[in-house]
Amino acid sequence: MIHHLKGQLIEKNPTYVVIECNGIGYYINISLHTFSLIPDSEAVSVYTHLQVKEDSHTLYGFAEKSEREIFRLLISVSGVGTSTARMMLSSLQPREVTEAIASEDVATIQSVKGIGAKTAQRVILDLKDKVLKVLGDDEVFVSQSNTNKEEALSALEILGYNRRQAGKVVEKILKEDPESTVESIIKMALKKL
């Protein structure tokens, strides 16, 4: 297993990088998240995951250890391959993926191209406990945020608003200010609906 590679950056693209280590150029598949974090300088370091198949050895690179761990968790789910896991980490920030799994947010996971309702539910079912262990202290924040979101959505639904439309507005509000109280979420949502 190759844990990480440190060397000279030869080529950098949104889907891969080439890093030269001791005269050997390694082609490493990356996510958009990693692409945005890798500096354009010559000396770089990436954490790697090596996938060995009958016909190929493929390297996947990550700017952060946490992203690699999420990738490994995702590919452990039946029906989620390396391409789908990389697509998830390109479409969503690693933190958004873990929060969506921890809060059982099927819609967020399903928003990734190539993931249907069944796969999204399987990802949540298989990984929720593992993700909560990884999150540790942040688990409280996730569940609190999810509770505030659910309470605000229920209140807006009682007021006669469509749950789906209200959900989109509440998501935007929570992205701007994740620590919003239920009352402030409802007030801001009423202004935007």
Swiss-Prot record:
Q: Does the keyword Ubl conjugation apply?
A: no
Q: Which residue stretches belong to region Domain II?
A: 64-142
Q: CDD domains annotated for this entry? A: UBA_RuvA_C (cd14332)
> Where in or outside the cell is it found?
Cytoplasm
UniProt region (Flexible linker), positions on chain? 143-145
Q: Which UniProt keywords apply?
A: Cytoplasm, DNA damage, DNA recombination, DNA repair, DNA-binding
Q: Does the keyword DNA repair apply?
A: yes
BP-aspect Gene Ontology terms: DNA recombination; DNA repair
GO MF annotation list: ATP binding; four-way junction DNA binding; four-way junction helicase activity
Region annotation Domain I: residue ranges?
Answer: 1-63
Annotated region described as Domain III, given as residue ranges = 145-193
Major site of localization recorded for this protein: cytoplasm
CC annotations in GO: cytoplasm; Holliday junction helicase complex; Holliday junction resolvase complex
Q: What is known of its domains?
A: Has three domains with a flexible linker between the domains II and III and assumes an 'L' shape. Domain III is highly mobile and contacts RuvB.
Q: Which NCBIfam families match?
A: ruvA
Function per UniProt: The RuvA-RuvB-RuvC complex processes Holliday junction (HJ) DNA during genetic recombination and DNA repair, while the RuvA-RuvB complex plays an important role in the rescue of blocked DNA replication forks via replication fork reversal (RFR). RuvA specifically binds to HJ cruciform DNA, conferring on it an open structure. The RuvB hexamer acts as an ATP-dependent pump, pulling dsDNA into and through the RuvAB complex. HJ branch migration allows RuvC to scan DNA until it finds its consensus sequence, where it cleaves and resolves the cruciform DNA.
Task: Indicate the family of this protein.
Answer: Belongs to the RuvA family.
> How is the subunit organization of this protein annotated in UniProt?
Homotetramer. Forms an RuvA(8)-RuvB(12)-Holliday junction (HJ) complex. HJ DNA is sandwiched between 2 RuvA tetramers; dsDNA enters through RuvA and exits via RuvB. An RuvB hexamer assembles on each DNA strand where it exits the tetramer. Each RuvB hexamer is contacted by two RuvA subunits (via domain III) on 2 adjacent RuvB subunits; this complex drives branch migration. In the full resolvosome a probable DNA-RuvA(4)-RuvB(12)-RuvC(2) complex forms which resolves the HJ.
Listed name of the protein: Holliday junction branch migration complex subunit RuvA
